[in-house]
């Protein structure tokens, strides 16, 4: 009797740990930042003027569901790299920032989207240091997978 009670408890415990989820339906794929079939903007080596606008335009895609995206712009006065582009742009001499442009914003993507076209006008402040900058896009899908795209741009 003791053996059957212990066996029953063990069987119940193991059953509670099992899952009916099908592992084949789990999202295991990174989202994509696409520039094909649109006029993607910005792209590597583009030059912008202080006081102008960067017309951001990219397509995001995921096999299951998109989540959100982030745009970050920061100076590259020290010539660091993020390693997502093979394009080399002409760079100014290294320098110390005085009034660098720092932009970092999160954007929601409506629920249930597998493809989304992101278009935003980003105003460049008139009082920022001119020079080399990185424009970074971080795209996250609903499962938490993230894709990064970094481009070198210049502000004059």
Question: What role is predicted for each listed range?
Answer:
Residues 46, 54-65, 75-77, 141:
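Extracellular acidic, Ser/Thr/Pro-rich low-complexity tracts
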Residues 12-39:
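Bacterial Sec-dependent N-terminal signal peptides
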Residues 99-121:
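Aromatic sugar-binding surface patches on proteins
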Residues 148-156:
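C-terminal edge beta-strand
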Residues 40-48:
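Short beta-strand segments of immunoglobulin-like
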Residues 114, 126-131:
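Surface-exposed, short loops/turns at beta-strand junctions within beta-sandwich domains
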Residues 137-139:
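Conserved structural position at the C-terminal beta-strand
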Residues 4-14:
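Sec-dependent N-terminal signal peptides
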